[in-house]
Curated annotation (Swiss-Prot):
Tissue-specific expression: Restricted to flowers.
InterPro entries referenced in this protein's UniProt entry, alphabetically: DMP
One Pfam short name: DUF679
Gene name, Swiss-Prot/TrEMBL: DMP10
Predominant location category: membrane
Protein's UniProt name: Protein DMP10
GO cellular component, one term: membrane
Length: 191
């Protein structure tokens, strides 16, 4: 039992890395203001702001699934975006005369190329974010119909809550079985 628990810890950490903490923090911080505390029944501006916030955060989750980093031969950490040709470096220092890609071997270059798994991870990351967003009471009160528990709206909200729990459980299994090889921007451990 102890060995299986120890083996599951890296998977739990990987799950936390796949949903960008900054994105979740921005969402939880701005949602009460944008949704007027969940009271946007007759205020289309608040609904629009809430939908815009959710869209922006979902796009950030999707985009962050394609970011990676590595340490160059000069000891600096380089951040980039995965492309079909490899990693496109974002923080290059051309004025110092060092080529950050010169330290990458052919097998490392291959590792940083965009793959189908990256798109699957990006899609699942967005689904996880949306499932967590639905769990917010401000989100539900602003955008989902909520009548008494015996009406269709009440059943719909209850179904959404259970659906979110199911999605999060399935995503945690998915991320444990198919861990991401991307480290993202801001992950401090060095390979």
């Amino acid at each position: 039992m102890e060995a299986s628990f120890i083996r599951s810890l890296p998977s739990a950490g990987n799950f936390a890395n796949l949903l960008p903490t900054g994105t979740a923090l921005i969402f939880e911080t701005l949602l009460p203001s944008f949704s007027n505390g969940g009271e946007c029944n007759n205020k289309p501006v608040n609904k629009l702001l809430t939908i815009t916030l959710i869209s922006f955060c979902a796009a950030a989750c999707f985009f962050s699934s394609f970011t990676d980093s590595y340490v160059g031969q000069d000891g600096r950490i380089y951040y980039g975006i995965a492309t079909s040709n490899g990693l496109h470096i974002l923080n290059d220092y051309p004025d110092e005369g060092y080529d950050p890609e010169s330290g990458l071997t052919a097998d490392k270059r291959e590792r940083y190329k965009l793959s189908f798994v990256d798109f699957v991870h990006a899609f699942v990351s967005v689904i996880v974010f949306l499932a967590l967003a639905v769990e917010s009471s401000d989100f539900r009160r602003c955008l989902l119909p909520e009548d008494d528990e015996n009406s269709w709206g009440g059943h719909f909200v209850l179904m959404i809550k259970y659906f979110a729990v199911m999605v999060l459980t399935m995503a945690s299994f998915f991320f444990a079985i198919f861990p991401s090889k991307r480290r993202g921007i801001g992950i401090s451990d060095i390979r």
